[in-house]
Amino acid sequence: MKHVAPPPTTEAVFGDRLPLAQRYAEFLATAGVERGLIGPRETDRIWDRHILNSAALGELVESGDRIADIGSGAGLPGIPLALARPDVHVTLIEPMQRRCEFLTEVVDALGVAVIVVRGRAEDPAVRREVGEMDVVTSRAVGSLDKLATWSMGILRESGRMLALKGARAEAEIEENRRVLARAGAVDVRVLRCGADYLNPPATVVEARRATPSNGRGRPGRSSRR
């Protein structure tokens, strides 16, 4: 496999799982490129732009959280998050068979307890299979209005959507406030994370699924906590 050297700050993020993160980087730089999951020009910035950017979400989750990564693609942000935070439970949701095969190969090779589910987050069958989640993550999957609709559908009451976004995050929130509200998303805000090892830090849109007391919620569905 191609060796992709991590930056010096990476050990603080992954700890004793750094060798697994390095192996994942090699997967991305080889099979990921060959299968069209990562662009060939991305190999020189796999760590900063992809792996560390994804792992930064580890600052925003809690121990024991059940996390669904929707439209996982090459495993971003789900796999780096699982490596940085072995105390959470990650499920990768991806509709394309060839991508699911790649994800399964990576998960098996790394020996991590990550579940791969083929399907779309909005599919009732997927929702039944994965149940209600504490957190839903996403990266480069779709517009904020679509992400909110997909995410709220598999979140428990008060569960959180964490969507990695770019410089237009604030503007995207303003443009979609009505749709976000209809989807049951409340407390929508922009967070920055990974400032100790990313320049600029990762930009994340956080939203909570409404409960009957603060918004729409879903009548008849109970929260986990």
From Swiss-Prot:
Primary enzyme class: transferase
Disulfide bonds listed in the record: none
Cellular compartments annotated: Cytoplasm
Domain of life from the UniProt record: Bacteria
Residues reported to bind S-adenosyl-L-methionine: 71, 76, 121-122, 139
EC number(s) stated in the UniProt entry for this protein: 2.1.1.-
HAMAP family xrefs: 16SrRNA_methyltr_G
Name of the protein described by the UniProt record: Ribosomal RNA small subunit methyltransferase G
